[in-house]
Amino acid sequence: MTDLPDSTRWQLWIVAFGFFMQSLDTTIVNTALPSMAQSLGESPLHMHMVIVSYVLTVAVMLPASGWLADKVGVRNIFFTAIVLFTLGSLFCALSGTLNELLLARALQGVGGAMMVPVGRLTVMKIVPREQYMAAMTFVTLPGQVGPLLGPALGGLLVEYASWHWIFLINIPVGIIGAIATLMLMPNYTMQTRRFDLSGFLLLAVGMAVLTLALDGSKGTGLSPLAITGLVAVGVVALVLYLLHARNNHRALFSLKLFRTRTFSLGLAGSFAGRIGSGMLPFMTPVFLQIGLGFSPFHAGLMMIPMVLGSMGMKRIVVQVVNRFGYRRVLVATTLGLSLVTLLFMTTALLGWYYVLPFVLFLQGMVNSTRFSSMNTLTLKDLPDNLASSGNSLLSMIMQLSMSIGVTIAGLLLGLFGSQHVSVDSGTTQTVFMYTWLSMAFIIALPAFIFARVPNDTHQNVAISRRKRSAQ
């Protein structure tokens, strides 16, 4: 990339900072949740909605981000994304109640949903095709550093300042990024087809109300009648989308995608698999602080081995899949992650705290292998004219399943515990033990889906996508 013009390199730095802001905010909040609960006068059992409100908003808004960038221009949308994310951070820091914090997190999510996909689109437009891979590696590297720094930085700020600072640190970075975007980034636009607003609204309503209904009376305090009504609305919205998308060439996501068996299996496995995996980044720091009495900073440091294991495994995951095939790798890593989850709980309850970093490192390795394998399995056989749509649907499903996973984790805590779980409670570790056992069971379930992957899905096919007609 040394032969790129200086202006292009500055534009890549802007995109990289956007990736860093979004990835840092995804993990920095987790270690602060118990302190937030105490400050806001809420039960820790309700704080999972701080994560759900952000991730669910990202899932809902993702399908619109690419179309908006093509229609309005990448500079305008990227600038808007940074401004919304920064304003959301400010409102989060100023929140005095949980409901205010949830609304502010949703505003952050709107910005976060546009930041990463529009950033990728920007790189595609400003960099020659032969240098695209090197440029994407450069801009995504800060996105890998964010999860590494997030838990420890969040714990440090909570312990030595207050939880408000995990949001306030975004403000100067956001201001600099917004100014740099206006000054340096070109405003590429493209001719766009008509946006499928009806399909977008149907999917948004379906995802949002079903997730809210899943949270149920334990999290939102809704009556059984209200929950039943939400489920009915959500199911009807999704069924209407299926009817809307059938034989509709302008549909948000074409149903032709599901004619590819590996896409259908991979998408179903990714959805179910990330529900289980999505529980772990939320539950681990909460358990370390509330269940074991760790300080926020100590709990944040304990998350670093998991990120290191994940980053290290990415270097060899292709060779592993080529050697053993998708079915074996996905079934083995799914069951392995379930066992590692049980190992973490057992080690923690026995008081072998010095072993926990090694267990979390192993968890990161297994999880990373499974994530990479799920992603490539889902997309590898799609025809070229459906690849972009399939990738967008996968990105949306990834965010949606993570929000559902965190919601289920909060629901499990509510089922097994009282409304006020604290370090001083004698039953706290028992509550977490039952929750962890349930999580291990949920994590293992997608193995039944991955067992249906064709046995010959392996080796060089892992990297290439067959070109064939979508008709």
Swiss-Prot record:
It holds the Pfam family MFS_1. Disulfide bonds: none annotated. Residues 33-48, 98-101, 159-164, 218-224, 284-285, 363-395, 452-471 are cytoplasmic. It is a multi-pass membrane protein. One of its GO terms (molecular function) is transmembrane transporter activity. Keywords: Cell inner membrane, Cell membrane, Membrane, Transmembrane, Transmembrane helix, Transport. InterPro entries: EmrB-like, MFS, MFS_dom, MFS_trans_sf, Multi-R_MdtD. Gene3D superfamilies: MFS general substrate transporter like domains, Multidrug resistance protein D. Residues 1-11, 70-76, 125-137, 186-196, 246-262, 307-341, 417-430 are periplasmic. The chain crosses the membrane at residues 12-32, 49-69, 77-97, 102-124, 138-158, 165-185, 197-217, 225-245, 263-283, 286-306, 342-362, 396-416, 431-451. It is found in: Cell inner membrane. GO terms for cellular component: plasma membrane. Belongs to the major facilitator superfamily. TCR/Tet family. This is Putative multidrug resistance protein MdtD.
